[in-house]
Amino acid sequence: MTNHWVDIKNANVVVVMGGNAAEAHPVGFRWAMEAKNNNDATLIVVDPRFTRTASVADIYAPIRSGTDITFLSGVLLYLIENNKINAEYVKHYTNASLLVRDDFAFEEGLFSGYDAEKRQYDKSSWNYQFDENGYAKRDETLTHPRCVWNLLKQHVSRYTPEVVENICGTPKADFLKVCDVLASTSAADRTTTFLYALGWTQHTVGAQNIRTMAMIQLLLGNMGMAGGGVNALRGHSNIQGLTDLGLLSTSLPGYLTLPSDKQTDLQSYLSANTPKATLPEQVNYWSNYPKFFVSLMKSFYGEAAQKVNDWGFEWLPKWDQAYDVIKYFNMMDNGKVTGYICQGFNPVASFPDKNKVVRSLSKLKYMVVIDPLVTETSTFWQNHGESNDVDPSAIQTEVFRLPSTCFAEEDGSIANSGRWLQWHWKGQDAPGEARNDGEILAGIYHRLRELYRTEGGKGAEPLLKMSWRYKQPDHPESEEVAKENNGYALADLYDQNGTLLAKKGQLLNSFALLRDDGSTASSCWIYTGSWTEQGNQMANRDNADPSGLGNTLGWAWAWPLNRRVLYNRASADINGKPWDAKRMLIQWNGSKWVGNDIPDFNTAPPGSNTGPFIMQQEGLGRLFALDKLAEGPFPEHYEPMETPLGTNPLHPKVVSSPVVRLYEEDAIRLGKKDKFPYVGTTYRLTEHFHTWTKHALLNSIAQPEQFVEISEGLAKSKGIANGDWVKVSSKRGFIRAVAVVTRRLRTLNVNGQQVETVGIPLHWGFEGVARKGYIANTLTPNVGDSNSQTPEYKAFLVNIEKA
């Protein structure tokens, strides 16, 4: 989230799209209801299903799954054509006025630079025009034909209300009603907040879904505002912490990047990741990348990391390609993986194409499962009839189960969707032989290091040089790790005037103190300030709220630097006056920035040319994304890989995303509409949490049996009655479930045909105390978003018949 949960109450309009907050985030959803009940906010829901969220909405608009970009691009066009934008915000705080290269183009579904053989773009034309000083050219009158504003207007001109209705199946009147309410928040004293979740991310165009929404927020002037922003509702407790700490194959903690095999030395790596400002007088905060990286290496390797050895740069692995789950299981399926350590995951139930996952795991020599519960992954080799029809005697994979603790059995911090790090304390000891994950990993690490020390072997140095200075080396305490994340001064730190800022050995209170000379250590720079010499800031429990905005700065700690709303400089105009006095976050008092949040902008007074989006090279919000996304610098509608239309109404020659990575063996397992004519989409229920809570008796009583939802029209055409058992199949497999016939799903008229949706809750499997069921991801395709490789769980093709 750019904002936070409590801030939702400040919105005038709450849009839930790409999620079902009332069902999947019932506690957090109270703040949407607070906005509705106490701030007279309008609640809008755009969803393929009439959900529990929709049941309390003021406006509900149905949409075909996988067409969000068309809907949102239609909103962009409406705002532009009706001049419903915050013009001053757009002019001064976005890149609307910057000029784009003359060779950038878009035609028939493709941007300039496309290589059909490689299925990727040469993105060199997706850039600004630059002057002799290396700065982007600008036309503040917004009249130049190559300025971002005019290129955007041209690009979205196709997304008329009629086109939205034709592609999305959303009735034109419903769409225009949504546009009209959103447009009302172009006024400086009104804001919209967008709440989204996996309903946007789990598509082959997931990142572009989110980006299109962010562009709407920029046009409306809602970024940086209380009651505004881009707000992801994270799907797991502490999944925010997972991404913060870089648990992805090409990431390092704090959103740093793991070096690639093309970055053979430290200088080439730092040059590639340290941007230069593209407009004068910009903060360009990523210019501090070397400080963050060197401090990370000092935390990793301690005294072994020195300037003479490039701070241990050679000890980091260098990636040749992203090893996401789709890639990794494809390698596994092809016999290229020997072992798999599975920590806190249930791939058999959670990853796409369950039958391929089981087949892949069957080709391993060994697998280690670290989990508090018995998962389908840990017992994938057992036969459970139709739902997991395997031959155990043919599977030679040796499975090691290491029982771990759950959150209630350990101390530590949890990072929520709003970037708040909240410390929690152990409620009880773990049962049996269960150990926390840190203790388990420490045990593996020490045994590996001892083997390398005594026997040698390839890649020994990174393990042998690693710093491991915990009081109990076999059991690092959460407090020690948290302080390590925060960071220490390794020498006395002085400012340029000779003033002492921190003594050697002290915990740091700001990442502004991090250095690239080896005098500081921090294993996650964005967490610096979370545990200072004043104590554990994450344990703060003062919920005083003098502003009434919900920015309880004394409750827990938010990264960065306890700031609750990112880019809050944009909440004030260029003169430092808040756009809306009653929603004031920061303002200029004549000498400095002050207010109801931690200012993210301490460097320049009003009247300077310094933009509010301090992490960007140009200091501006990007309506034109440059080369940052795989599909293009503007969002474009591409059909899901399995489309019920068989074409793309906008450009039939380019139906789906042209840059999707698709393995041959997965391509042949994609279905066509002649055999699988209905759209399948997966989702969650309030009564369960993924595949965990089928181990809990109360949850299993509340929702005991697997079911799917279909419309009354589809039920009638297939002869299915409410309560009948049905078989739902895709090109990859089938499941059996009870049919729930409901008006919550509509038959949509799309491009001259009727489109039906089959709703598939995902919680069942063959483990736990709940009634045994089929794994929903038996049906889903093994293809993902081209940027994140998040699988396309939300739009695929199925058939349904009475069982």
Question: Each predicted region: which residue ranges?
Answer:
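Short beta-alpha connecting loops at secondary-structure transitions
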Residues: S55-I63, S378-F380, S387, P403, ...
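A glycine-rich phosphate-binding loop feature that marks nucleotide/adenosyl-phosphate handling sites
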Residues: H92-A96, V181-L182, A197-G199, G229-Q240, ...
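Long, contiguous, secondary-structure-rich segments that constitute the structural scaffold
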Residues: E439-N497, N589, N596-P606, F613-G619, ...
